[in-house]
Each structure stands twice: as structure tokens, then as C-alpha cells.
Amino acid sequence: TPIKSSAASDVYKRQILQYVQAGQEGGNAFADVVSGDVTPSGKMTDTWAKDYYDYPGAEVYSYKSGDLMKEKYEEGIFVGYRYFDTFEVPVRYSFGYGMSYTDFEIRTNDIKVSGRGMMNPKVSVTVTVTNTGDTYAGKEVVQIYASCPQGRLVKEFRRLAVFGKTKLLAPKESQTMTITFPLYQLTSYEEESASWILEPGMYGIWIG
């Protein structure tokens, strides 16, 4: 759902706590977070643009397309954060963004590919996450993105391949974790052959 966040950002300069459909324990959870008993560790699952018309579908949505009964998505593969990343559109809050009461350092230890064929190989990324803060314990979400070569198939700038969450880390505590994802996550669909293709070229891994 497109969200216009300019007004909220002007009023709340430092932070916004998104509190949606929290359930019967939502009140207790809210109190735990605002009191500092629990450190927030959630990340954005979509992109908040600076302006409504920054969303690619804004110009043809609803009555603007001339047909209230149908909505045509013209973005192709550039849906959500893939559009904003690929075309370098400035945003208010990016996909995967989220604040915490503490700070973390993520150090990459190893990246390797194992297995054979198309369905069995996997990419393993090993990182060490350290809570570098002095006061609050917290959890961090490690996000792994991949950039695919721009060959004959059109691709987005980068895609989310996998993510993993640490345990609750005390100040100065570290955790080493290995996060894996199947190699076919890096394939692209070719309509002519109706198949998923892993094109040759340079692939990039983004960790954060």
C-alpha cells in the first residue's frame, strides 16, 4: 500500500514507532518498548516514499487509468524496493530500515557456494554481529542482498536473498552466525523459454 510520510516526518524529526495490529498483548509490548525494557529490532517490510507520486503506480491508480474495475501493474520486475533501488529514487524510509536503542557491528567472515546442479547448490554467508552499545541488550537482523549481472535479461539493481536474526545480545557481546540461501534465488525468468536462468557474469553480495 503506498504511504505518504512527508507530514509525519515533518512533525516527528527523530523517530516513529509503527504500531499496527499488535493483538491482545499489544499494550504490554508497546509499554515494554517505550519504557526501554525491550529494544526494538523490527525492520521495514516495504518502502516509504517521500511523496505519493514517487510510487511508480501512482499515475495510473484507480480512476487515473480510466478503469475503476481493473488495476494494471506496469512496474514489471521493479516492484517495491526494487524500483526505488534500481532507479535511485530518494525515499523517506527504505525497505529493511529499522532503528534500535543500541548499535551493532556486522563483520563478514566468509562467503562460499556449495553443492552441484541448479536445485542443490547454496550460498552460505558467515558473519559476526557485535552489540557495540554500552547500555541496552538487543537483537539485530542481518540482511543479505544480491546483485546479478546485467546480461540479456533485465534485472533489478539488487534483491533480498535471505535474512537472519541474532539472539538477544548484551552490550559488547558477539554472535557468529551462518545464513544460507539456495543458488536459484539468483536466477531470472526468461519468457521465451519459460525457464529460470542463471546468467554468467559477476554477482555481488551485500551484507547489512
What is each residue range found by the language model?
Residues 78, 88-92, 101-208:
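Intrinsically disordered, low-complexity Ser/Thr/Gly-rich stretches
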Residues 25, 39-58, 79-80, 90-93, ...:
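Acidic/polar loop patches that form or flank catalytic/metal-binding clefts of enzymes
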Residues 12, 17, 45-48, 110, ...:
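Residues embedded in well-ordered beta-strands within globular domains across many folds
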Residues 15-27:
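Acidic, His- and aromatic-enriched active-site or binding-groove loops in soluble protein domains
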Residues 59-67:
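Active-site-adjacent elements of ketosynthase-type condensing enzymes
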